[in-house]
Amino acid sequence: VYGLDASEYLLFAASTDNACPPQASINSQGLWDELSEADLAQSRVAYSLALASNVLSRADELHAAWAVDEGNFVADFANAGLGNSVYSTSQEALNDLSDALFYVEKVVKDYKLARPIGILGCSQITCPENVESRFSRMSKEAIIANLQAAHHIFTGAQGEETSLGLEDYLVSVEGGEALALPMVESLTQTVAALEGMDSTIYDAVAEEG
């Protein structure tokens, strides 16, 4: 298992049990029981280092793909429909940009929120075990980061700066302003509401259940 979710478990989960079935050799042969707390801690450290190295490598690859002096995908996007861009038309680039925003609906709304609060894929009142980052209790911060990224994509701006983004394109299209401005306002208000929460999402969901 690779990724930040595995790293989270290694760093924050307190259990010293394993989830392997009884017939697995590590359990059936008593290998797990032979491990001391120090052995388990050392194994967690070693695995965490391997995971961190993998995440760093993937992050470097992503950065290189966009970097002007390397993959320069930013030029492909900016010059969509021109020259050697991977996009044959500017509309294709805009479609990719708008598709990326559906992460908020499909993942943030339906997966990160609807599942734990009992709306989707949950047979109980709430399912706190479905909360993202439940071991570190960092789900709220992760969702805030997702929404801030969506705001950045939509407006082209980060923080207090001003820039051109998908919002400006929609405003320039007849009837588009009625969609663009409420989206910006909704993203801003949702981030503010999350930042104003006193508890973690896990604790809030568990309390409701």
Segments (PLM) and residue ranges:
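Mature extracytoplasmic or organellar-lumen-exposed domains after removal of signal/transit peptides
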Residues: 1-209
